[in-house]
Amino acid sequence: MNLSVAIVDIIGIPYDGTTLEKRGLGGSESAVILMSKELTKLGFSVTVFNNCVDDAKPGIYDGVSYRNVKDIPDNEQFDVVISSRTVFPFVPKQLQNMINFDASAFSFMRTHAKLKIVWMHDTFCAGDHILENLVVNGFIDELFTLS
């Protein structure tokens, strides 16, 4: 049985699995593309939810499914959910007044994931003022940081 991984990038610029071949791209977005490919090669089922608009199209690229972040499913379960550069997908309803973002679309995803990870690429993390609270109270399981 292969594990399903959702990578959520709600603050990145538009991209899909072919963007690196067509134009320059930020390091965080490039990392999502490249890591997704590698995880797929290792046998994981990977879905990237990001801004698939303009020249970035939803579809399957190198075995990775790219879907528009606005189409977050309300009944699809992922074993691992990785949020790139923000805690927003993991903020429970009772804490959403602390952020300027409606995270209700992520409710099913966050409550059914076996492992919830924030992948920090930059010097900031959207929602960093509640990051510690979310980790201490079990809403986020792991933090990945780049040096």
Named regions from a protein language model:
Residues G27-A31, I82, L146:
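Soluble or luminal CAZymes and related metallo-dependent hydrolases
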